[in-house]
């Protein structure tokens, strides 16, 4: 597919509110690691993708990779909804070394927080927390400020704060 054709399709999906652009967050960093400046796309309503794939909960449970992508889009959608009354925005972070945060929550006064989305599993939660701690250490906190919080957003049942200060929060616990 040619690039102009792809642009036409992406613009149509945006106008139909099927995808939403999430721009890259570019904080002041301590290191010289280049950042990826390209935005990412998330589905406005991940249930549409499940319908197009003609799958149900059992089908998604047998394809955890697809379920993970849909869960991440669901989480980003909900975070955007909860930030709207605060005039905040959801961005993403990824550098050329592969360090990423699925969502960076930014408020107009400069406060920020980083979020990794993991459906569950202690190993995945540990990986997400490690990524968040690495990101917080990499950011020049004198210029950007310390993160308001670091959170691994999960599909689990219990919210808790780890000894390293990273919050582990089920998506179901988020509310206004």
Regions found by a protein language model. Name each.
Residues 1-111:
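Accessory nucleic acid-recognition modules appended to NTPase machines
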Residues 114, 151-152:
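Structural beta-sheet core signal
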């Amino acid at each position: 597919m040619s690039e102009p054709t792809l642009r036409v399709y992406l613009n149509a999906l945006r106008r139909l509110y099927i995808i939403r652009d999430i721009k890259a967050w570019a904080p002041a960093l301590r290191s010289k690691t280049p950042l990826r400046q390209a935005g990412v796309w998330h589905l406005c309503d991940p249930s549409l993708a499940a319908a197009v794939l003609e799958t149900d909960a059992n089908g998604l449970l047998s394809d955890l990779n697809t379920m993970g992508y849909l869960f991440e889009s669901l989480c980003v959608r909900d975070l955007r909804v909860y930030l709207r009354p605060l005039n905040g925005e959801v961005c993403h972070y990824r550098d050329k070394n592969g360090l990423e945060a699925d969502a960076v929550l930014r408020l107009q006064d400069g406060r920020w927080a980083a979020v990794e989305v993991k459906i569950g599993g202690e190993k995945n939660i540990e990986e997400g927390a490690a990524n968040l701690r690495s990101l917080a250490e990499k950011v020049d906190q004198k210029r950007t400020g310390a993160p308001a919080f670091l959170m691994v957003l999960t599909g689990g049942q219990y919210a808790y704060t780890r000894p390293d200060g990273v919050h582990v929060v089920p998506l179901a616990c988020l509310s206004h």
